[in-house]
């Protein structure tokens, strides 16, 4: 056994090359044991490598590499490993090889990324030996069928050739495509490179045996290429693949921005114009409202054209199909369907609100209860609680009245057809001026009803804002207009809001500053940024600054590194409100990206800024950046949640709420639990609200602590000595937990994995309730109905059932509160014992008379008890439209005997087009009527009695 390498090392000093070669071979065999001894003579080995006349110089490089590896000098080790050429075996499983390959890939990645950012002429050449090792590594991954690993390395090293090759060579091409698309959406931080990857994915998807148009369109949304989407839709209509076109339209509406959708609609309209002039088309002037009529017209045209001998292509069908697609893309269909779902399945427990109403004693909690009521009834159109408590509601004065009126907009969210009629009482009138707070609230409510789907209401709000003579009405009008025209970047709207901003009125300016951001959402409009930042630096009004702080951030929504220059300048500003704007801008620009640079910046500010508001905003903003990986958030903010600074603790609570919204994340709840007992009341408020955001729609089975928190909210609300701030948080938390009649969740990304713009905006503005309670209503933008809605070829809901393969209690509605009348009953029963005794006597007499009957009854009762003891079934059938929670989608299937087949997997949820495999007549789901005030003429008269014959005796 060798105890020293000194003898072998001495051979390196020999003149004979063969002896040196022999020494190197021996050293290579013992280097792992004697590297410390060999390291003293490593310079001799280096000299051998540098001697170009030496035959085994590559072997010298390998030994030197191993020595440097053991010394921890990985860079030198890598250089010599490259010099070893083929002697460095990438397929070897030793720790040395694994480490050097990792360093090699890191080094190669760094060079590739640096080159990618440089113009063509300035790119640095990459060492061919380095590339050779990486290529060998790729081949090893492919040979071992480690395709995901290869895709990951290919994307890191910007090797699109390898990326494409890996997908095509894999044994599961659709699976690899889905994996790559997910990586693109969640992890890729450079926009330019992401777009190149998406182009490759589009190419592969289109070249599949059966092109996957649904995923192609998801890629095209990211690429912001509405023209290509329009071309696909046009192609599908021509190929008579209408159902696929409809499905894509619904997916587009859910994932794309308003500007993108309007471009697609515009393209479809221009495509549709020649088709519209087909002779005999009777459908040109009609709005696609009454589908039955238009369908019957189509069949008539078909038969007519067939008789004359024309081809079916000449029929006027496409015009009607285009109209239907436009109706879907405009969001009209989805909003109507979601409204139907929420009205039909409304399961609000009014007892919760009644108990809260009876417990509150001041105006802040009164306002909170009104807001909580609107959350609970969001989109259900049910204003029953307000109608039952008009006297209590009338206590709201001034801005509380503004908030209460605006809450109707949340209740009637999406109820667009009758919006003006519903709100008529509260809107400004030419004749007699009403309460300014009520009128302002009414205009704000109209914006909430039409949020991100303005249409014609934008012009109405534009005129109302022009004619408003009062700053309160202008405040509501600006917010309403911003919501309705969200993301449209309309110049006339922008100019009017800018005029209102420049009036230098604090109340108007706050709303106008925020509304400017809403209208220019994600546009990165240089003029808008210049105007807003310029005015923010001039104005003396803190309120205007606050509005602009959020508005500026919204303009940079989703722009990632393009916002860096603005973020830098805002973060350096002397004004703390503008520094806070910088934090929000980071949150909006990088929302959902998980970008490490952005996280580092926010964490640095969270512990270093001198202003509490800025620190709080920085921590809150972490939630927006991490929401795609909610499991990471608790570890990032856990230390901040124990900070000595209460503002940082509050920010940590809200960050958890935002990031883990709707997930029921146990770690997040464990962090929030101690914060609900914080000595500082506003920290408790944040913890209570955040806990509701996380546990929305969770049941005791999916999240065991949900009932414990329900009781906590109730305890805080009913405790007379508790602080108003904590009570405000608890009341809002109750509203959030049971939002939308228990039928909505909060999610910052769409079902297809895109960042859901209205949700992100809604949650960001909601956090501003810290300064201004009426902004709480913005949370309604983030509520997403948890539904599966199946539609047939006519875009109607057929009667169909879905099978949920888990116990009904797993995702059941929470049990309603029991009416507390039991105690009174007990008192009464003890007071009338004599009567019960008499009743028992009578029962005994009956028993004697009807023994047989009683036996039967008892037997029946026993059967009932046995039935109750029966085990819970393992599945449940849900009727269309069905309430299906995100976690439940995994276990959702179509029953085997079902005549309908979904066009995309049920596990994605949302609105799904169903293909009918049967020729039988379909049964359709009857639409339900919305609640709310009705015009008197519309009320149905009682039906006349049935005809009868009067016989005079």
Curated annotation (Swiss-Prot):
It comes from the Eukaryota. The modification Phosphothreonine is found at residues 273, 311, 830. Keywords: Acetylation, Phosphoprotein, Proteasome, Repeat. PC repeats lie at residues 403-436, 441-474, 476-510, 511-545, 547-580, 581-616, 617-649, 651-685, 686-726, 729-761. Gene3D superfamilies: Leucine-rich Repeat Variant. One of its GO terms (molecular function) is ubiquitin protein ligase binding. Pfam families: HEAT_2, PC_rep, RPN2_C, RPN2_N. The modification N6-acetyllysine is found at residues 310, 720. The modification N-acetylmethionine is found at residue 1. Disulfide bonds: none annotated. The modification Phosphoserine is found at residues 290, 315, 834. InterPro entries: 26S_Psome_Rpn2, ARM-like, ARM-type_fold, Proteasome/cyclosome_rpt, PSMD1_RPN2_N, RPN2_C. GO terms for biological process: proteasome-mediated ubiquitin-dependent protein catabolic process; regulation of protein catabolic process. Residues 279-318, 839-881, 930-953 are annotated as: Disordered. Residues 290-303, 842-852, 859-872 have a biased composition (Basic and acidic residues). Residues 936-953 have a biased composition (Acidic residues). Component of the 26S proteasome, a multiprotein complex involved in the ATP-dependent degradation of ubiquitinated proteins. This complex plays a key role in the maintenance of protein homeostasis by removing misfolded or damaged proteins, which could impair cellular functions, and by removing proteins whose functions are no longer required. Therefore, the proteasome participates in numerous cellular processes, including cell cycle progression, apoptosis, or DNA damage repair. Belongs to the proteasome subunit S1 family. Component of the 19S proteasome regulatory particle complex. The 26S proteasome consists of a 20S core particle (CP) and two 19S regulatory subunits (RP). The regulatory particle is made of a lid composed of 9 subunits, a base containing 6 ATPases and few additional components including PSMD1. Interacts with ADRM1. Interacts with ZFAND1. This is 26S proteasome non-ATPase regulatory subunit 1.
């Amino acid at each position: 056994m060798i105890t020293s390498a000194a003898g072998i090392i001495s051979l390196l000093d020999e003149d004979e090359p063969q002896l040196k070669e022999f020494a190197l071979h021996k050293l290579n065999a013992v280097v792992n044991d004697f590297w410390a001894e060999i390291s003293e003579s490593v310079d001799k080995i280096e000299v051998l490598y540098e001697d170009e006349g030496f035959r085994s110089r590559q072997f010298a490089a390998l030994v030197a590499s191993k020595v440097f590896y053991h010394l921890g000098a990985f860079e030198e080790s890598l250089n010599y490993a490259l010099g070893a050429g083929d002697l460095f075996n990438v397929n070897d499983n030793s720790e040395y090889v694994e480490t050097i390959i990792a360093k090699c890939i890191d080094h190669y990645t760094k060079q590739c990324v640096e080159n990618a950012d440089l113009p063509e002429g300035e790119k640095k050449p990459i060492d061919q030996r380095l590339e050779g090792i990486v290529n060998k590594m790729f081949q090893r991954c492919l040979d071992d069928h480690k395709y995901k690993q290869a895709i990951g390395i290919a994307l890191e090293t910007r090797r699109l050739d390898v990326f494409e090759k890996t997908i095509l060579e894999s044994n599961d091409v659709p699976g690899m495509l889905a994996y790559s698309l997910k990586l693109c959406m969640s992890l890729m931080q450079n926009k330019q490179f992401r777009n190149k990857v998406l182009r490759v994915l589009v190419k592969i998807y289109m070249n599949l045996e059966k092109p996957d148009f649904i995923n192609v369109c998801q890629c095209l949304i990211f690429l912001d290429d509405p023209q290509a989407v329009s071309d696909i839709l046009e192609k599908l209509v021509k190929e008579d693949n209408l159902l696929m076109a409809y499905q894509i339209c619904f997916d587009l509406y859910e994932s794309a921005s308003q500007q993108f959708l309007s471009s697609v609609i515009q393209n479809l309209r221009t495509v549709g114009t020649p088709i519209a002039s087909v002779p005999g088309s009777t459908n040109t002037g009609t709005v696609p409202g009454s589908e039955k009529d238009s369908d019957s017209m189509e069949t008539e045209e078909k038969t007519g054209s067939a008789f004359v001998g024309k081809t079916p292509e000449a029929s006027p069908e496409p015009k009607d199909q285009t109209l239907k697609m436009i109706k879907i893309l405009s969001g009209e269909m989805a909003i109507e369907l979601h409204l139907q779902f929420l009205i039909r399945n409304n399961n609000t427990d009014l007892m919760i609100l009644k108990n809260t109403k009876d417990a509150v004693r001041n105006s802040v909690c009164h306002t909170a209860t009104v807001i909580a009521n609107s959350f609970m009834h969001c989109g259900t159109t049910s204003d029953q609680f307000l109608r039952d408590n008009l006297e209590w509601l009338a206590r709201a004065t001034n801005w509380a009245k503004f908030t209460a009126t605006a809450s109707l907009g949340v209740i009637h969210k999406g109820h667009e057809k009758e919006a003006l009629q519903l709100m008529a009482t509260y809107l400004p009138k030419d004749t007699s001026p009403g309460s300014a707070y009520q009128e302002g609230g009414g205009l704000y409510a109209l914006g909430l009803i039409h949020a991100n789907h303005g249409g014609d209401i934008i012009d109405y709000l534009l005129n109302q804002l022009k004619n408003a003579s009062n700053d309160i009405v202008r405040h509501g009008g600006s917010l309403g207009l911003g919501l309705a025209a969200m993301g449209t970047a309309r110049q006339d709207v922008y100019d009017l809001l800018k005029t209102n901003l420049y009036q230098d009125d604090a109340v108007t300016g706050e709303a106008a500053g925020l509304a400017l951001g809403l209208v220019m959402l994600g546009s990165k409009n240089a003029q808008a940024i210049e105007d807003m930042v310029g005015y923010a630096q001039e104005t003396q009004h803190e309120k205007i600054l606050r509005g602009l702080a959020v508005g500026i951030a919204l303009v940079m929504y989703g722009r990632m590194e393009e916002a860096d220059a603005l973020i830098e300048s805002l973060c350096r500003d002397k004004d703390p409100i503008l520094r806070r704007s910088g934090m929000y801008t980071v949150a909006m620009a990088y929302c959902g990206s998980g970008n490490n640079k952005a996280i580092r910046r926010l964490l640095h500010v969270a512990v270093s800024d001198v202003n509490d508001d800025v620190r709080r905003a920085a921590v809150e903003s972490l939630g927006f950046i991490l929401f795609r990986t909610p499991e990471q958030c608790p570890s990032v903010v856990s230390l901040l949640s124990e900070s000595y600074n209460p503002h940082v603790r509050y920010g940590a609570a809200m960050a958890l709420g935002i990031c883990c919204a709707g997930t029921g994340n146990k770690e997040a709840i464990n962090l929030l639990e101690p914060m609900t007992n914080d000595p500082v009341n506003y920290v408790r408020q944040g913890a209570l609200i955040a806990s509701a955001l996380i546990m929305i729609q969770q049941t005791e089975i999916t999240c065991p602590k949900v009932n414990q928190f329900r009781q906590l909210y109730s305890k805080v609300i009913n405790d007379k000595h508790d602080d108003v701030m904590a009570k405000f948080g608890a009341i809002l938390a109750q509203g959030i937990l049971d939002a939308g009649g228990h039928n909505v969740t909060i999610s910052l990304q769409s079902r297809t994995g895109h960042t859901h713009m209205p949700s992100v905006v809604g949650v960001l503005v909601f956090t501003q309730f810290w300064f201004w309670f009426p902004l709480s209503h913005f949370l309604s933008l983030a509520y997403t109905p948890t539904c599966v809605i199946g539609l047939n070829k006519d875009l109607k809901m057929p009667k169909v059932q879905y099978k949920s393969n888990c116990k009904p209690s797993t995702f059941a509605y929470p049990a309603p509160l029991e009416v507390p009348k039991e105690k009174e009953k007990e008192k009464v029963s003890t007071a009338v014992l004599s009567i019960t005794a008499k009743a028992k006597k009578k029962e005994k007499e009956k028993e004697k008379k009807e023994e047989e009957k009683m036996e039967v009854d008892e037997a029946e009762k026993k059967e009932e008890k046995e039935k109750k003891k029966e085990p819970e079934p393992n599945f449940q059938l849900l009727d269309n439209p069905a309430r299906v929670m995100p976690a439940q989608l995994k276990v959702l299937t179509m029953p085997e005997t079902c005549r309908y087949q979904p066009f995309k997997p049920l596990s994605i949820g949302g609105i799904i087009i169903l293909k009918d495999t049967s020729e039988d007549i379909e049964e359709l789901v009857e639409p339900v009527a919305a609640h709310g005030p009705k015009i008197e003429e519309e009320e149905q008269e009682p039906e006349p009695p049935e005809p009868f014959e009067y016989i005079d005796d």
